[in-house]
Amino acid sequence: MLAKRIIPCLDVRDGQVVKGVQFRNHEIIGDIVPLAERYAKEGADELVFYDITASSDGRVVDKSWVSRVAEVIDIPFCVAGGIRSVEDAGKILSFGADKISINSPALSDPTLISRLADRYGVQCVVVGIDTWFDEKTGEYLVYQFTGDEKRTQQTPWKTLDWVQEVQQRGAGEIVLNMMNQDGVRQGYDLKQLALVRQVTQVPMIASGGAGEMSHFLDAFKLANVDGALAASVFHKQIININELKQYLAENGVKVRI
């Protein structure tokens, strides 16, 4: 059995790491490179960087910091933000990123997933899915351009349908960003994770809602996710990654220590 992964998420805007609540009201956390170094030293298995306004601004992720991160950390990292072409992805990979992640551009052009997988291999291609639970309909729905409050929009896709679609097109990994839970630290949406897990054959990462160590344990034990992504609990030093891994290991979860 593969070790479960602990993945700090760094939302990037204007060259700094920021964090919001339910994708709104972002506060500045700090500089990108020192935070990346800190998490690598604390025992993170990998890092994910989201340039949160790149897609809504119509630009690709700022590459200047990607190469700096590659120089200072020795763990894998994934970069997302406005990647609309095979060439965009190639540049980011050439600057040292191990994976690229696409979200809104994949919704605009689903063939991008297969083109990226064909060129760089499925192991490099992560698809992020911003999913919102609609209480009126009881459905999980996919949203697009969530980095910009003015442009955020619901798509025609239901989450479970889109999860299956991206796998068929060559996604090597799926990150499920549960918008209702984002930043509120009340726990991952275990019901949604379990539903998605049933239709997911590739590695699946939970994102949105971690507030205490037990939330990670629940995601691994009850929803069988492959990795758990979190931001504010690490940024605000509510949870130490080494201590989290010790806790998980003591509770029967295989992790790298």
Swiss-Prot record:
This is Imidazole glycerol phosphate synthase subunit HisF. One of its GO terms (biological process) is L-histidine biosynthetic process. IGPS catalyzes the conversion of PRFAR and glutamine to IGP, AICAR and glutamate. The HisF subunit catalyzes the cyclization activity that produces IGP and AICAR from PRFAR using the ammonia provided by the HisH subunit. Belongs to the HisA/HisF family. The active site is at D11, D130. One of its GO terms (molecular function) is imidazoleglycerol-phosphate synthase activity. Its main location: cytoplasm. Pfam families: His_biosynth. The keyword Lipid biosynthesis does not apply. Pathway: Amino-acid biosynthesis; L-histidine biosynthesis; L-histidine from 5-phospho-alpha-D-ribose 1-diphosphate: step 5/9. Its EC number is 4.3.2.10.
